[in-house]
Amino acid sequence: MSAKPIPVFGLTVTRIHLLGAGGMGLAPLGLYLAQLGFRVSGEDDGWNPAVREILARAGVALTAAGALPDDVQLVVYSSAVAATHDSRRRATARGLPQVRRGEMLAEVVKGKKLVAIAGSHGKTTTSAMLITALHRAQFPCGWILGGLFNGDTLPPAQASDADWVLAEVDESDGTIDRFRPEVTVVVNLDWDHADHYPQLADLETTFAALLARTRGAIFLSDACQMSARITARGGLTASVHTFGRTGDFQCHLLSDISSGQELALGGDFSLKQARVRAHGEFNASNAGAALAVAQHLGASITRDSLADFAGVRRRQTVLHASSIQVYEDYAHHPTEIRALLKALRRDGGSPSLDKLGTLSQSNGLAGGPGTAQAPALHKQNPRLVVVFQPHRYTRTAQFKAEFAAALAGADSLFLMDVYAASEAPVAGGTTADIYAELKKSGAADHVTYLPGSDAGLMLVLKGALKSGDTLVFVGAGDIDRTAREFVARLKAEEEREAAWHDFLPAARSRLSPETKLLERELLAPKTTMRVGGPARVYAEPAATADLQVLLHEAARLKLPVLLLGRGSNLIIPDAGVDGLVISLGHENWQKFEPQPDGRIFAGAGLRLKNLCGLATKAGLKGFEFLEGIPGSVGGALRMNAGAMGGWMFDVVEAVQLMTLAGEVRTMPKAGMHVDYRHCAELQDAIALGAWLRPAASAEATDIRRQIDVYQKKRVESQPREPSAGCIFKNPPGASAGRLIDEAGLKGERVGDAEVSTVHANFIVNRGHATSADIIGLVKKVRARVMAARGVILEPEVLLYGQEWRDVL
C-alpha cells in the first residue's frame, strides 16, 4: 500500500490516535489505517489479548488509558467513549480534531467503490462470508470487518490499491449517513438503538436515505418487511436485487450436518449448489447474500467458495465441549436471542472441531461457523442454561418485555447487570426490569439474578450446572471475559477430576490394606461444628509408608492435600473440598510412649483429652490445660493450641514431621517459628508426633483435681452446643468476645447458626446450620463490631480449603 497517507477531512494528517481501540469497530479500522500509511496509536480501558496482538503486529502503538500522545494530529473515538474521557478532554484542550469511528471509516473509503454491508442482525457474518468468497476467488479488493475471524484465518482488515472495498457499516450512532456506497447489502432491518432512533420510522428513514445514496446495486432480504416498504416508495436509482427463499437470488437449505450445510441455489445464481461451513436458516440467508454480491461483482464463485468459511468470534463460538458444553454469542437484541435459543434447542448443542483444534459452531442467527466434523458429546435435548448480560440501558428499556419473552425459552436463566457502554442509567432500563417482566409472565421460577454481584452469580451458576447441560453466555458487552474466566475454571476442575481418576487406582495399588481411601466422604460428622460437604478423596493412612504414597501420588498429579485432625477450629464449606483430605485417625498414629529421658512421644492422631488422661495415669503433670481442647496432637501443634493460660509449644521439645515431598524430619522447638495460633513449619508439612516434656511428676489425684477445676471453668464459660471453638482472634489489647457482646450480638442468628449466649466469641450450631449460615453470621458480626467500635475482627477458625478473604 501507499507509504504516504491520503488526506482526510481536508487535512494533511499522518498521526492518528484511537480511543476505544480494543473494540470491534475501531480495532479493524486501526489496522486498515496503519496499512494506509498512517502512524496509529490506540488505547482502551479493557483490552482483549487477541486484539492487542493483532494491532501490535500491525505496528499500532498501544498506550495507557488517558495518556494521549503529544504528537497526535487526529483523534478517532468509539461512540461508547464519552466527551468526559480523559483523552478526549485533553484532545479538546489541545484543539485536536475528533471524529467518530463511522465518520473516519466513511472518509477513508470515499475514494473507493464501496460495498456496504448493513442491517440489524447478521452483517458481521455476512461481511465475513463475502470477504471469504472474494478472497478465495482472488478478487482484488480491500475490506474492514466489524469482528475477528476465528483462528485468525484472515485479517479483520486489509487495505488494497484495488477499486473495491468492503465495509461493515453500523447504523447505531447515525454515522451511516456519511456513506455513499456503490453496492449496499441490507441483511435485515429491526428496530433498535432507541437512543438514536426514538421511533421505528426514524430507522426506516435512515435506511431509505442510504439506499437512495447507493449508486450501483442494492441487495435486500426477501423476508424483510421494512426493506420492502422502502423499495415500494420508489426513488431509488440503483438496481434492486433480493435474496432468500423466494428472492431474485434464491437460496434453500438442503441439509445441515456437523460439517456444515448444503444449499440449493436458483433464480439469478449461476450455481446450482453451495457448501457452507455454517449452520441454520439464518446463516443460509447470510451465505445467499454473500454469494449473490460476489457474483454481481464479477468474482468467480464455486460450490466450495464458503466450504472452509472460518466464521467470526463471539458468534455462537463453542468455548468448551465436554460433559458440559459452553457457547458464547454476541446476540443482544430479542430477535437474535430467540433465533439463538431456537437453534441451540434444535441442534442439541452438538459441537464441531476445526483444524486448528479450537471449537466453534453456529446454529443459525448472525453467527459463527461450523467446522470440520466431530462427534456429538451430548445427549439429545440437553438442558439449556443461559447467562445474559443486557447491553445498554436504552435498549433494555426499549425491549425489556421482548427480552423476557425471548429468554423464557431457557431452562435455566442467569441474569447479569446491564453493560452500560458509557450510557447513564435510564428508567425501566435495568436488569431488574427484565426480571420484573419475567415475574409478570410467570417465567421467573427458573431465573437467578443477584443485583450488583455478577461474581456471586457465577458461583451459583457453577453449582447449578449438571452433566449434559448446554450453557451459553449471551450479550455484546464484556460478558465474553466472564465466559472465558468461567470456562478456564471449568477446564481446571475437569482436569482435576481426570487427575483424581488417575490418582485413585495408582494410590490403591501401593497402599497397605489397613489404609482407608474413600471418595466423597462426608466431613461434617468428623468436625466439632457438624457442618460441611464431602472430601473429593478421604484417606486414613495406616503407616508412614502409606502417608508417603499418598503425598507422592498427589504431588505427581498436582492435587491439593489437606490435613484433618479432630475437626475443631475449622469450617468446612457446604460444597465440600476438592482435595485429598488426610486424617491420622488410624490407631498407629495415637501413640503415647514414655521415653527413658522422662519425655513423652505423642502421636499426631492422639486426642488431647486422651493425652491428658494417659499423662494423669502416669503421674505426669503439665498437660492439664489441654484436656478441654477438642483436638488432636497434630492439630494442636499446627495451630499452637492454647487454653487456660497454656500453649501447646510450652510442653514441646521437638516435632517429627513429614514434608509434602514425603521426607521425614525431626525439628527441635528452638528451630521452629511459633507464635499465636500458628506454627510456620507445619503450614506446608504434616506433624507425625512430638516429644513432650512434663512439668513434673505428681499424684494422679492431684492432677485430676486441677483438670476438674479447668473443666468447671470451661462448662461455666463455654457453650455445650456444637461449635468450632473461638471464631475470632482477639484484637491487640482487646477481647473479641467482649466486643461482640457489647455490640449486642449474643443470640444473633443466621439460619441455625447462632452467636452463643454463653460466650460471644463462639458460633454454635443449633441443629441444622450450614457453612453458608456460619459465614453469613461471621460477616454480620464483623460488620456490626466495625460499625460500633471501629475494630475489624479477623477469623481464628480456618475456612477449610478456602481463604476467608475470598468470602468476606
Give the positions of each predicted feature.
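Phosphate-binding loop of NTP-binding sites
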Residues: Y32-Q35, A56, D70, S79-D222, ...
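Anion-binding (especially nucleotide phosphate/pyrophosphate-binding) glycine-rich loop
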Residues: W500-V633
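Short Gly/Ser/Thr- and charged-rich N-terminal loops/segments
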Residues: K355-L377
